[in-house]
Regions:
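N-terminal low-complexity segments that are often proline-rich with Ser/Thr-Pro
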Residues: 128-161
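Thiamine diphosphate
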Residues: 1-125
Length: 161
């Protein structure tokens, strides 16, 4: 039986992506997902991957778009306000049927000053700028579903086409 390891949620997401074959990470630091990017910055060079801190959220998602267009397994992550900046790039990827993993590590405020629950990032599931499905797993499902979900996405499966 394999050894059990206790790690933070951000690090577990990064490790799941790596085990699913992700070798390219493009991101921009924003709390609370900075730990995910920091983990990728340590591990990617050790496995022959690419870690690049972009100059903005928009640049990061467009780097993922370029990588996905070239047929490589790439991902980015952000937090709710950063995901808002990435929606145009996300829509281009969806419209082009390009697989990518985009992690939204949600937080409360500052956009609405905390008048909505801290899970307001879920609104993006239904009100994005494109007409495409967003694959979403709830937190309780991560241990069982996430690695398999990432493998499916990286393999190029388009859900709901």
């Amino acid at each position: 039986m394999s050894e059990r390891v206790l790690m933070k949620g951000n690090e577990a997401l990064a490790e799941a992506a790596i085990r699913a074959g992700c070798r390219h990470f493009f991101g921009y630091p924003i709390t609370p997902q900075t730990e995910l990017a920091a983990y990728m910055s340590k591990v990617m060079p050790k496995i022959g991957g690419t870690y690049l801190q972009a100059e903005s959220e928009i640049a990061a998602v467009n780097m993922v778009l370029g990588a996905a267009s070239a047929g490589v397994r790439a991902m980015t992550s952000s937090s709710s306000p950063g995901i808002s900046l990435k929606t145009e790039g996300i829509s281009y990827m969806a419209g082009s049927d390009l697989p990518a993993v985009i992690i939204n590590v949600q937080r409360g405020g500052p956009g609405l000053g905390g008048i909505q629950p801290s899970h307001e990032g879920f609104l993006l599931l239904f009100h994005d700028v494109g007409d495409h499905l967003v694959v979403h797993t709830s937190v309780v499902q991560f241990q069982l579903c996430l690695p398999h979900l990432l493998v499916g996405i990286f393999a190029g499966y388009i859900v709901g086409d």
